[in-house]
Amino acid sequence: MSLNRNQFLDNFQNRLSAQFTGTQNWWTKSLFHFTDIKNAISIIENGKIYSRNKVIELNLMQNDNANDSVILNTNNEHKNYVRLYFGPSTPTQKNNEGIKPKDKIFQNAHCPIPIMFVFDFKKIFLLQNIRFTDGNLATNPNIYENIEYLNNLNFNLIYHRSWLQNDEMKSKIINARHSEVIVRDELNLENNLRFIAVRSEAEKEYLLYCLSDIMKRIFENKIFVQPQTGIFTNDWLYVDRVSLFENQLNITWHLCGNLSCSGKFKLYV
């Protein structure tokens, strides 16, 4: 490698960001990990994201929002890695995100209140023992260790978020969207995290409420409500705002994007 690791990453990111405009442009500086709020609280309190196997070993799993069949078909060795995506709003996230009617939940894949941890692309790739893939780990993709192979990835497919035609490219694009960066066992938030994104003021307030006082002080200025476009799919029901006025509770909802959840929810206060 003619350039050192730091120089290579600077050069690569400059070239990558020049290829994309709008939403995808800021993705070139970031890596993404989404999980349900219950898991997010544990991550923040522990100061790190653990691999799936480590989370189970430490009994820290609060909400297993993964698809049963995907987990079943994932090599157990791959479960020893923390998994980050190159871009948000992946097909998996779209399938899992939001409060959904029971008849719309497939194989227990459900993330009612998603929290997005946004990491610094360069800082992650400067860590030791970083690997990355050209597809979903569950599909046994190519796994690379040498960062020069970043040049082999097709970011036009990885960042593709347009409507998918039912043709031979569909499965290839879906798999590419799930290209990952993997970190052995655990990933520290400190020095690597850019910010945490949530969907609404209500979800931000709830997340902060659930944190310990010390973590609340540390993270209250790092949690933002949809600071950039494209982080969440916003397809399903969620609470946008909650206010209390003269003993009256007011809840403002973000409604479903279609009629498939009409009349299927009950609210208990």
Regions found by a protein language model. Give the residues of each.
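Active-site-proximal loop/hinge segments that shape catalytic or ion-binding/gating pockets
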Residues: 2-269
